[in-house]
A protein has these predicted regions:
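Short, surface-exposed secondary-structure boundary micro-motifs
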Residues: 148-149
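Beta-strand residues that line the small-molecule/cofactor-binding core
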Residues: 152
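Acidic-enriched and Gly/Ser
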Residues: 2-142, 158-167, 171-191
Length: 191
């Protein structure tokens, strides 16, 4: 019987590895990623590490604990071929794969290696918390961000809740825009 239309049409580029976006149940992103990794499949959850402080009983000094916070909930990025995707859609912890609604034909949403690299860079930046908006941010000018190590990072400035705060965004067409608050002195106009 199978999954019917969820399997989709086999593309000519079925042997090329791409970043597909799988939808999983709420609060299972990390465990789904771990299961995929145990299966030998490259998987990524958009998350950031943060330190939390907890009261520790009678002690005066609070306990510090590092936690992994999921930024894009209910989604796991999986680096696989089309043939592998057809096998994984049968796994019980994967609800479905996202459809790319920007095309007329029914294709599955994929993220380029470059966009995934940029998203990982943003999530690795510890000075600010990355937020994710499932909205269409296409306005703003293209900028280069200084301070991501030796890597040059390019994105677009978006305005959110006021004109005085600058945000840098990475556009993932199927999901929206991941954005990070950046100090204006760290931005340079793209030439």
């Amino acid at each position: 019987m199978g999954t019917g239309g969820a399997v989709g049409v086999l593309k000519a580029s079925s042997k090329k590895r791409e970043w597909f976006i799988a939808r999983v149940s709420p609060n299972t992103e990390k465990s789904s990623r771990d299961r995929l990794l145990q299966m030998g499949v490259e998987a990524f959850v958009a998350s950031q590490e943060e330190y939390r402080f907890y009261k520790n009983g009678d002690r005066k000094k609070p306990r510090k604990k590092k936690v992994e916070l999921v930024v894009i909930t209910q989604y796991v990025f999986i680096h696989i071929t089309e043939i592998e995707r057809r096998r994984l859609v049968e796994e019980p912890f994967i609800r479905c794969f996202l459809i790319d609604r920007t095309h007329e034909e029914r294709t599955f949403a994929t993220v380029s290696d470059e966009k995934m690299h940029q998203l990982k860079l943003m999530l690795g930046y510890q000075d600010a918390q990355v937020q994710f908006a499932a909205a269409d941010y296409t306005i703003g000018e293209e900028v280069t961000v200084k301070g991501f190590g030796s890597q040059e990072y390019t994105g677009h400035v978006v305005r959110l809740r006021g004109d005085k705060t600058s945000y840098i965004g990475v556009r993932i067409d199927a999901l929206g825009c991941a954005y990070l608050e950046i100090a204006p002195q760290r931005l340079a106009k793209k030439q």
